């Protein structure tokens, strides 16, 4: 651009100098030559103007081209910068990618090592599982054989339980009959007469004695006519001996022998405990309670009622259940009845109406978990029996045992409507089912059977208005 300007200026200077040198030579010519000169000058001026226009146009084109080139340079510079930025970003990305690739390679190597370890563990587990599966198959075979043996043993045990229950029922029935016969012989004879030497009474005589004696005579006649249903004395003796072998030894000493002073007189039965009213403070605690789980139970006592309803004789409560064992009476129940509760809410309603006459009576309530059988004896007579009551159940140890009140919590929350009013004497509890002869001996005033786990010697606390009375014979107590 600068070179072009210089050339244009140089051309103008040369042109002007030529025109200047021509002017003096022309002055000498005549005036007639001035006109063409001016025309030439005018044409030159027009040419110069055209040239100037062309030059300006050319210069404008050059300037425009320069601007285009300048813009292109700017754009190229921008593109260079952008390419540099892209290259930098590419370098950074490449560095990051290389780092990620290195990390992935490291992770891949670690994964390979872990996979090899896992493969080794899986192989070991597979081997162990195969070994255990073989052992499991062998154990399953052994367990199957054991289950078959257990099933066979259960059938044998069930058969033995059935046989034992049948024998126990026979022993109780035979004992009740023998006790009735002993009572008849004692009332009919003034001396001691052997049972085998007495003359069998006639049906007329038995009818005069009462319907119970006549029914007993009929049972004996049926037994004689049916030998297959008759139990010999030898069988009964053997069963009694077997039952005595399984009696649990007790830490309590046997009570002193009771003195039998004739019909209707029971003496030396332990102190008499008198509950005068329905106060909730009238309660007796026994300790220790049951030290071992009980699968059988015998509760026997002399009782004299002083009200028209039976109160609660005994209550055994644990933290899990406040009615694990209850002889529960209440003024809202049927007169003369109590609820025999084992493991609430199961119970059996027992009728004790003979006790409402205000006289002394001997009661024995017996229960065993074998087939859930239970028996109620009043004055040595079997008055009620049943089965399927808490079959297979165990009365747990460690609870609170009280007389005269029903516990709604362990050792408390008594209700006066459930309180016992009357007298108790000779109370004892066994962890086995007493035999009928043992029950008859108790009702006759003889010594306690061995193995009693609780008696009135275990009384640890007497509360409220409960009184202790020492009477030679029960009939003499107030």
From Swiss-Prot:
It is found in: Secreted. Ca(2+) 2 binds at residues 406, 408. It comes from the Eukaryota. Ca(2+) 1 binds at residues 322-323, 406-408. One of its GO terms (molecular function) is metal ion binding. The keyword Nuclease does not apply. Residues 1-25 form the signal peptide. Disulfide bonds join 300-364. Induction: Induced by lipopolysaccharide (LPS) in thymus. Down-regulated by LPS in liver, lung, heart, spleen, dendritic cells and peritoneal macrophages. Induced by TNF-alpha in dendritic cells and peritoneal macrophages. Glycans are attached at residue 91. This is Pentraxin-4. It comes from Mus musculus (Mouse).
């Amino acid at each position: 651009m600068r070179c072009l300007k210089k050339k244009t200026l140089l051309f103008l200077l040369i042109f002007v100098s030529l025109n200047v040198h021509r002017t003096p030579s022309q002055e000498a010519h005549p005036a007639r030559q001035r006109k063409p000169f001016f025309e030439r000058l005018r044409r030159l001026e027009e040419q110069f103007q055209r040239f100037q226009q062309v030059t300006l146009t050319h210069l404008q084109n050059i300037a425009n081209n320069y601007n285009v080139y300048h813009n292109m340079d700017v754009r190229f510079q921008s593109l260079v910068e952008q390419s540099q930025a892209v290259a930098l970003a590419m370098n950074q990305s490449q560095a990051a990618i290389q780092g990620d690739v290195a990390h992935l390679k490291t992770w891949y190597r670690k994964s390979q090592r872990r996979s090899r370890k896992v493969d080794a563990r899986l192989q070991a587990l597979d081997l162990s599982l195969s070994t255990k599966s073989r052992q499991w198959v062998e154990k399953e075979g052994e367990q199957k054989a054991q289950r078959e043996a257990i099933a066979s043993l259960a059938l044998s045990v069930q058969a033995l339980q059935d046989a034992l229950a049948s024998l126990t029922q026979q022993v109780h029935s035979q004992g009740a009959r023998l006790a009735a016969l002993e009572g008849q012989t004692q009332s009919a004879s003034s001396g001691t007469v052997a049972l085998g030497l007495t003359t069998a009474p006639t049906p007329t005589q038995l009818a005069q004695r009462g319907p119970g004696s006549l029914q007993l005579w009929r049972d004996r006649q049926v037994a004689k006519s049916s030998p297959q249903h008759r139990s010999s004395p030898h069988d009964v003796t053997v069963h009694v001996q077997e039952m005595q072998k399984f009696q649990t030894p007790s830490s309590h000493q046997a009570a002193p022998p009771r003195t039998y002073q004739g019909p209707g007189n029971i003496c030396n039965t332990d102190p008499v405990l008198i509950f005068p009213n329905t106060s909730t403070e009238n309660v007796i605690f026994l300790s220790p309670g049951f030290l071992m789980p009980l699968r059988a139970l015998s509760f026997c006592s002399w009782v004299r009622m002083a009200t028209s309803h039976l109160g609660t004789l005994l209550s055994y409560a644990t933290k899990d259940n406040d009615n694990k064992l209850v002889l529960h009476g209440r003024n809202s129940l049927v007169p003369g009845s109590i609820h025999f509760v084992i493991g609430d809410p199961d119970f059996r309603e027992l009728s004790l109406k003979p006790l409402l006459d205000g006289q002394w009576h001997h009661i024995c309530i017996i229960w065993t978990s074998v087939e859930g059988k239970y028996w109620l004896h009043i004055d040595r007579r079997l008055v009620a029996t049943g089965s399927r009551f808490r079959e297979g159940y165990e009365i747990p140890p460690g609870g609170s045992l009280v007389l005269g009140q029903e516990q709604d919590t362990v050792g408390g929350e008594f209700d006066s409507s459930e309180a016992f009013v009357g007298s108790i004497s000779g109370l004892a509890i066994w962890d086995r089912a007493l035999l009928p002869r043992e029950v008859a001996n108790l009702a006759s005033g003889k010594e306690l059977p061995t193995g009693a786990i609780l008696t009135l010697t275990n009384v640890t606390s007497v509360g409220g208005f409960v009184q202790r009375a020492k009477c030679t014979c029960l009939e003499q107590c107030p």
